[in-house]
Curated annotation (Swiss-Prot):
<feature type="short sequence motif" description="Histidine box-1">
    <location>
        <begin position="141"/>
        <end position="145"/>
    </location>
</feature>
<feature type="transmembrane region">
    <location>
        <begin position="120"/>
        <end position="140"/>
    </location>
</feature>
<keyword id="KW-0560">Oxidoreductase</keyword>
<keyword id="KW-0503">Monooxygenase</keyword>
<feature type="transmembrane region">
    <location>
        <begin position="86"/>
        <end position="106"/>
    </location>
</feature>
<dbReference type="GO" id="GO:0005506">
    <property type="term" value="F:iron ion binding"/>
</dbReference>
<keyword id="KW-0472">Membrane</keyword>
<dbReference type="GO" id="GO:0000254">
    <property type="term" value="F:C-4 methylsterol oxidase activity"/>
</dbReference>
<keyword id="KW-0753">Steroid metabolism</keyword>
<keyword id="KW-0752">Steroid biosynthesis</keyword>
<dbReference type="GO" id="GO:0005789">
    <property type="term" value="C:endoplasmic reticulum membrane"/>
</dbReference>
<dbReference type="GO" id="GO:0016126">
    <property type="term" value="P:sterol biosynthetic process"/>
</dbReference>
<dbReference type="GO" id="GO:0008395">
    <property type="term" value="F:steroid hydroxylase activity"/>
</dbReference>
<dbReference type="InterPro" id="IPR006694">
    <property type="entry name" value="Fatty_acid_hydroxylase"/>
</dbReference>
<protein>
    <recommendedName>
        <fullName>Cholesterol 25-hydroxylase-like protein 2</fullName>
        <ecNumber>1.14.99.-</ecNumber>
    </recommendedName>
</protein>
<dbReference type="Pfam" id="PF04116">
    <property type="entry name" value="FA_hydroxylase"/>
</dbReference>
<keyword id="KW-0444">Lipid biosynthesis</keyword>
Amino acid sequence: MLDISNTTWDLSNQSVLQPLWDYLQQNHESSLRSPLFPVILSVSMYLVLVFFYTVLDLLAPTWPSIRRYQIHQDRTVTWSNIGSTLALTTYNHLLYIFPAAVAQWLWRPPIPLPREAPTLTAFLLGIVGCTVVFDFQYYLWHLLHHRVGWLYRTFHALHHQYRQTFSLVTQYLSAWELFSVGFWTTVDPLLLQCHCLTAWAFMLFNIWVSTEDHCGYDFPWAMHRLVPFGLWGGALRHDAHHQLPGTNFAPFFAHWDWLGGTATMPAPVKTKKRDDKEA
């Protein structure tokens, strides 16, 4: 006899992500278990995003439909800007990221994969939870490295060589800052006991919103326009931080800067255009 109550219970607890997870395990298990996989995933995501935004930067001077969304419409991203930021990014990856990845590949055993996928609720809450924790960690790190002069000069001043943000500035970082960001991105899902699928999704989300913060554009689909009540900082607020380095320290959310008295509200792009005409 069919036990309808147990069948209903099993279906209700089966994750909608299970088919995807089953496919990934059946077809790409060896790749997913490799210690190199998170590194390749994150680097690939970053390169795709910066390629997209860099193409926009190069087209913007002659394409008004793109330029209208630039935060600083009177400035252009030059080949020199692209070359210098890309050179440091390449240097950091070759000198630090690649050797660390190879070391993990040599000495760390393959990662065991759970049979079951996370529930959709656990998946989404895990990403949100990791983002909240990372936001707090980097807010404190960022505030400290601006308030202590030696820390700023030694580790963080490099990132502020560019007052105009564009995508490649995202990882225009010292080795210490790059290590700090990578450490929290890796450890936070472990602290919250997230499924590995959730951890990888958080990693991709973190790279996406970090690059968006530095992209130099105020698009209608930007995170700060999607998250209600002004809770998300976004590209405008982070650009304001590069203009006024004593403000807007939190990387993603806005509440820590509100509570800490370090928040500043940038003018929207359209207001800037109108002000320029009036001037």
